[in-house]
C-alpha cells in the first residue's frame, strides 16, 4: 500500500527536490547576465547584497542572485562550476537542514553557496570539519573564492594564541574542527577580562561529515581539566588485585552495554583483601572507584584495539575512525587504571574545570546545517535531538557501483584467507582495492598475510595519521592495495587512475560489519564516485563481534548440519537479515545511550548557561556593588530564616547563633550581640542587620577607595569559578552512582534532576557566602590584579588538559586576596570603635 502511495504522489524527499529544481532553473536563467559582469562588477555584488540586507531584505530574497554569483566566481577562480544538484544541496543548507550527498559529489563546493549567503549578514559563519587537515585544505582552496568576492576567511587551529584566534573569529567565514570551536567556547567562559574572549555570538555553522560529529562523537563530552595531586599507588595495588578475580564467579561482563560488575563473591574478596567490612560504605568510595576502574581496564579495554602504548604513554584509539587521539585521556580514573595495568607511570587524576557535550554546544547556534554521504539511517536522531531534517540529494550521474551479497564463513581464519585470496586475484589484474577493517590489530594481521603473499600495499590506520590523505588519494590508482581502519581518510576523494575504469573501478572489501549500517555504507561509498564504475563485497565470519554478540548460534548450527567446510562461504538471506537486525538493535541502543547522555547533560546545561551568563555579566559591568550587596543580603536573610523560623515563638530562637553567624559571615566581629536582638521581630532583626551591612560596606568603600570595584570583581569571579568547578565534580559523582536508584524503583533521571537542582542551589548559596565574607572582611593588596582566581583548588594551572574528541586549551588564570586572621580583624575593629568614640 505504501509503495502504491509513493508511486502516485512520490515521497516527501522527491517532492522537495523537484520543487528546488524549479528554483535552480531560475538561478540558471541569471547565468548569462552574471557571466557578462567584469571581475570588479562581480565583486561589487557582495556590497550590494549587504546593503539590501541592511535595508531589511531577507536572505531568501537574494538567494537566487547570490548563488549565481558564487557559481560564476567559482568558475573564474577555481575552474569549477556548481552542478544543478549542488545548487539544491546549497539550498538545503541555507534552510538549516542536512544535505545527504554521496561521496565525490562535491560537498565542499556545495558549502560555498550557503556559506557566502549567510556570511553577508556579518555575524560570522563557522565551517566545521572533522580534522585540522581538512580545515586547512578547505580554507586554503575555498578561501580564494571568498576573497575574490570580498569576504575574509579565518582558520581556527589548535595552538593559536588568543589574539590570533580573535582575528580568525572576526573573519566573515571561519574554518576549524568541532573540538576547537567547542573548547574556545569553554575557554571564553574561563577568562578574567572580557577582552580575552575570542568568539562572537554563535550564528550559523555548517558541519561537514555531520553524522561523524553530531552522532559518532556525541557521547564524548569536551572537557578542560587540570591535574589534582593525589596518590597513585592505589591504582597499582588494585590493578594487581583484580588479576586474581575470575569471570562469572567474581565479576560479570555485559558486552552489549560494555559494563562490568562485581558479584557477591567478588565483593567479599575485595573486603577480605583490603580488610574492610563493607565495600559500599561511604568511607570506601575511593577504593570502590579504583577497583571498578582496574576491572574495566583489565577486561573491557584491549591494547591495540581501544588504545595503543607509545613512548610510555597510553594513547586512545578513536573507535569510529581508528585514529590515535593524542592528548585525550579517559576520565573517572580509567586512564590511570590502564596505565597501571600496562606497568606505566600513572599520571595524576584530573579535575574538570569546564565541560560541555557537542550536542549542547552546537544546539546553541542560531542556525545549524550539515553535509554527509550517510545521514538518512539516523534521520530520527537528527530530528529529535537537533531539529534537523535530512534531504537526500540526487547524484549528478547515476551510481554504477555493484554491491555483492555478504559472504559468511564459519571462522575468522577462513574469512581472512578468503579476503587475501580475493585481493591476490584482483591485484594480478591491477584493479585497485580498498580494504576496511575495524581495528588496528586486524589491519596489521591482514598486512602480515599480504606480505607473505608478496602483495605490496599501504596500511592506513591511526599510526600513519600524517600520511592519511596522501594514501587515500592514491587508493584508486592501478595496482593499489590499501588497508584502512574504519573510515580513516574520510573527506579525501579517491579518484580512479588511468585505465582503472576498464578493470571495474575501485573494489571495496569489508572484513567485518560495523555495528552501524551507516559506517558500512560509508565504506561502500568510497567506490563509484561521480558515476565511476566500482564494486563492494563484505566478508564475515560467525566469530565476528557483531555476530557473536547477537546470536550467531542458529546460523552456526545450520552450517554444521549442512556439513560445510571451514573455507566454504554461504550467501543467505537468513544471515543478511540477522546482521541487519543486529545492526538495528545496536543503532537503537546507541541512540538511547546518546539520548541518555543528552538528558543528563541538559540538567547541567541549564545550570551552565545561567552561570556563564552571570559570569559574562560580571566581566562586562564595571560596578558590581549592587551584585555584591545583594549577595550579602541573601546570606543575611538565610541566617535570619534559619535561626528565627516563623513556626517557632521568638523565645525559642537561637539569637546567639544568629549573632555569631552575622559577625563571622558578613559583619565585623562583635558588631551584633544576642542581647541586642532580644525582643525584636524577625523583620526588625533584618532591618538592623541590613543597616549594619550598609554602614560597614560604605566604610569599606571609603577605606579601599576606587580599587574596591576591581576587588569586588576578583572576589565574585573567584567564588563563582571555584564553586562551579566543585559543582561540576559533585554532579559527575552524583551521575556515576545515580543508576543505583533504579533498584529502589526510582527514576534515576528524575532523581538526578531533583538532586542536581538542590546541589545547584547549594552552590549559589556557597558563592554568596564566600563573596560576603571576602568583601566584608578581606584585606586588599596594594597591587590588586585578577590573577590566581582559581588557584587553591589543588590544580596545576600551567598544565591544563583537554579531552573530548582531542586537543588542548590554554586558559588564562587569575587572583584573590586572603582574609586577615581573627586577631588582626579584632584589633582593626577595636581601633575603629575607639575612633568612633572620639568623634
UniProtKB/Swiss-Prot annotation:
Binding site for ATP: 86, 104-108, 493
Gene Ontology BP, a term: protein transport by the Sec complex
Compartments, record wording: Cell membrane; Cytoplasm
Keywords from the named record: ATP-binding, Cell membrane, Cytoplasm, Membrane, Nucleotide-binding, Protein transport, Translocase, Translocation, Transport
InterPro entries: Helicase_ATP-bd, Helicase_C-like, P-loop_NTPase, SecA, SecA_CS, SecA_DEAD, SecA_motor_DEAD, SecA_preprotein_X-link_dom
Catalytic reactions on record: ATP + H2O + cellular proteinSide 1 = ADP + phosphate + cellular proteinSide 2
Any Pfam family hit: SecA_DEAD
Function: Part of the Sec protein translocase complex. Interacts with the SecYEG preprotein conducting channel. Has a central role in coupling the hydrolysis of ATP to the transfer of proteins into and across the cell membrane, serving as an ATP-driven molecular motor driving the stepwise translocation of polypeptide chains across the membrane.
Quaternary organization: Monomer and homodimer. Part of the essential Sec protein translocation apparatus which comprises SecA, SecYEG and auxiliary proteins SecDF. Other proteins may also be involved.
Family: Belongs to the SecA family.
Family matches, as HAMAP family: SecA
Name the record gives this protein: Protein translocase subunit SecA
